[in-house]
Amino acid sequence: MNQDMELPEAYTSASNDFRSDTFTTPTREMIEAALTATIGDAVYQEDIDTLKLEQHVAKLAGMEAGMFCVSGTLSNQIALRTHLTQPPYSILCDYRAHVYTHEAAGLAILSQAMVTPVIPSNGNYLTLEDIKKHYIPDDGDIHGAPTKVISLENTLHGIIHPLEELVRIKAWCMENDLRLHCDGARIWNASAESGVPLKQYGELFDSISICLSKSMGAPMGSILVGSHKFIKKANHFRKQQGGGVRQSGMMCKMAMVAIQGDWKGKMRRSHRMAHELARFCAEHGIPLESPADTNFVFLDLQKSKMNPDVLVKKSLKYGCKLMGGRVSFHYQISEESLEKIKQAILEAFEYSKKNPYDENGPTKIYRSESADAVGEIKTYKY
């Protein structure tokens, strides 16, 4: 680290942090559990707590095996690389998918894969018809890169992918010898809200990456699940990409505490708060980009003409942290902060009526301006 770099204030609470559900902090119970974690070498498959967590999550998802990764990005990239064998090939996904938009071109660099990003015709989630329209068959045409994997994200932008649509897509993938991967970073949320067990989702996919941090509240990690054969090969790519962790037992023991707790109750609490904010926005004419099925509310900044930086600064005025038009909820958000963020959004919306913001440029979730402003939470006056 640069010795001249100014350090941020110590992070103490996520109760007012709406930037992402990744900002949940480990509980005292998790930290205490880490003190009793096993200390075997997980790269050599000798750490008991790591093996227990991998087996437990795999069982929950109805899969044969699991593999601990330090992040969802790593588990996604390893999964897709494992499914792919000989280029040229392509991966089909939603145009908003994390594997396409927020994993630093990993598919192109690590898997040498072309990506076919698809805009859902219904505006919310991909249907079988959307996939068929953009699918590139392996029919001998040497000009294209045949589709080999369909990658779906559940939830995506907080939207639950309907089970009946997943069933249709799975059947078609089997007919066409295609692999089906799920970026299940927030599949816990989908399961808690829809009532669909993780095991039922697991029956529909060849692999799922399941995040342990985000709303679940563990400090880090993701479990990639699939068949024994798949995970054995995935472990090879994890090693290649520098993802082997030695004493991962501490992280896995902390994650197990989260999973064995009332995670469904935690998820549903965050969903209730998001639904309440969505109703508040509807009552005040504040447009949303998409349905608030679970723990995200996406404000439609284009329709509302809200300046995202004004929105961030209004939030700071009320002691809340926000990053652009995406409002993320997690179980550690306080009721008081919910009321404050409502007022911040309403003030930004009223401001936009007199000062409409219309910028022709890329829309970014992770805005550097917003990140800089959040750092001023203790001193900013607006």
UniProtKB/Swiss-Prot annotation:
Mind naming one GO cellular-component term on file for this protein?
A: cytosol
Q: Which UniProt keywords apply?
A: Lyase, Pyridoxal phosphate
Part of which pathway? Amino-acid degradation; L-threonine degradation via aldolase pathway; acetaldehyde and glycine from L-threonine: step 1/1
Q: Which InterPro entries match?
A: ArAA_b-elim_lyase/Thr_aldolase, Low_specificity_L-TA-like, PyrdxlP-dep_Trfase, PyrdxlP-dep_Trfase_major, PyrdxlP-dep_Trfase_small
NADP: is it a keyword of this entry? no
Give the enzyme's main class according to its UniProt record, as a single word. Answer: lyase
| CDD domains given in the database record | TA_like (cd06502)
Query: N6-(pyridoxal phosphate)lysine-modified residues are where?
Result: 214
GO MF terms, alphabetically ordered: L-allo-threonine aldolase activity
Which branch of life, at top level? Answer: Eukaryota
- Report the family membership: Belongs to the threonine aldolase family.
Q: What is this protein called?
A: Low-specificity L-threonine aldolase
Gene that encodes the chain? GLY1
